[in-house]
Design a protein with these regions (language model features):
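Generic structural signal for short, solvent-exposed loop/turn connectors between secondary structure elements
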Residues: 34-39, 116, 141-144
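Surface-exposed acidic, glycine/proline-enriched linker/cap segments
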Residues: 79-98
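A donor-sugar binding/catalytic signature common to diverse glycosyltransferases
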Residues: 97-142
């Protein structure tokens, strides 16, 4: 489960990170360290460049839902990073459906790598027996 870059705190500066490539590479390194123990990696993110980078690295081992994602490292359409955009009721409904699908799918996996988020916690609550860990080098974070 991979969030937008500003959710992660740079331990050197104690400020939010600004480099999405650093976030992607940290996540990929964490998955690379675990992938031999698993058949595949379920990539849960709303950010298309993150999906693209995972597919580039892990190829057919990547699993993800087929849906439209954000083209940039944005929090969510109409959210903090795009406050001038007003979502329609249909867009909100689709967003909620996608969130619930992601949480349900994550709760069915054998292991979750992620960071603090309501979705991460929801998946762990749905399956209290699942093993989990933080994305290495991204264990300092802000927001829920």
């Amino acid at each position: 489960m991979l969030r937008t870059t500003p959710h992660y705190i740079d331990p050197r500066t104690n400020r939010p990170l600004t480099d999405p490539n650093y976030v992607m590479e940290c996540a990929i390194e964490s998955v690379r360290n675990k992938i031999d123990d698993y058949d595949s990696v379920l990539v849960i993110t709303q950010i298309q460049p993150f999906i693209d980078r995972f597919v580039q690295e892990f190829g057919s081992k990547c699993i993800f839902t087929d849906r439209q994602r954000l083209k940039t490292d944005a929090d969510w359409k109409g959210g903090r990073s795009d406050a001038h955009y007003k979502m329609t009721d249909k867009e909100y409904e689709l967003e909620y459906q996608n969130v619930l699908l992601d949480v349900l799918l994550a709760s069915k996996t054998d292991h979750i790598l992620g960071s603090t988020s309501n979705m991460f916690m929801g998946a762990l609550i749905m399956n209290p027996n699942i093993t989990f860990g933080s994305i290495e080098k991204l264990s300092d974070f802000g927001g829920a």
